[in-house]
Amino acid sequence: LENGLLRKPPMG
């Protein structure tokens, strides 16, 4: 689940 936490830029 890449809700923004696993992504480079923390959007979530």
Curated annotation (Swiss-Prot):
Subcellular location: Lysosome
GO biological process, alphabetically ordered: carbohydrate catabolic process; glycolipid catabolic process
Transmembrane segments: none
Top-level taxonomic group: Eukaryota
Tissue expression per record: Placenta.
PTM section of the record: Glycosylated.
GO CC aspect terms: lysosome; membrane
GO molecular function: alpha-N-acetylgalactosaminidase activity
Enzyme class: hydrolase
EC number, UniProt record: 3.2.1.49
Keywords, in A-Z order: Glycoprotein, Glycosidase, Hydrolase, Lipid metabolism, Lysosome
Catalytic activity: Cleavage of non-reducing alpha-(1->3)-N-acetylgalactosamine residues from human blood group A and AB mucin glycoproteins, Forssman hapten and blood group A lacto series glycolipids; a neolactoside IV(3)-alpha-GalNAc,IV(2)-alpha-Fuc-nLc4Cer(d18:1(4E)) + H2O = a neolactoside IV(2)-alpha-Fuc-nLc4Cer(d18:1(4E)) + N-acetyl-alpha-D-galactosamine; a neolactoside IV(3)-alpha-GalNAc,IV(2)-alpha-Fuc-nLc4Cer(d18:0) + H2O = a neolactoside IV(2)-alpha-Fuc-nLc4Cer(d18:0) + N-acetyl-alpha-D-galactosamine; a globoside IV3GalNAc-Gb4Cer + H2O = N-acetyl-alpha-D-galactosamine + a globoside Gb4Cer
Family: Belongs to the glycosyl hydrolase 27 family.
Function in brief: Removes terminal alpha-N-acetylgalactosamine residues from glycolipids and glycopeptides. Required for the breakdown of glycolipids.
Subunit structure: Homodimer.
Stated name of the protein: Alpha-N-acetylgalactosaminidase
Organism: Bos indicus
UniProt gene name: NAGA
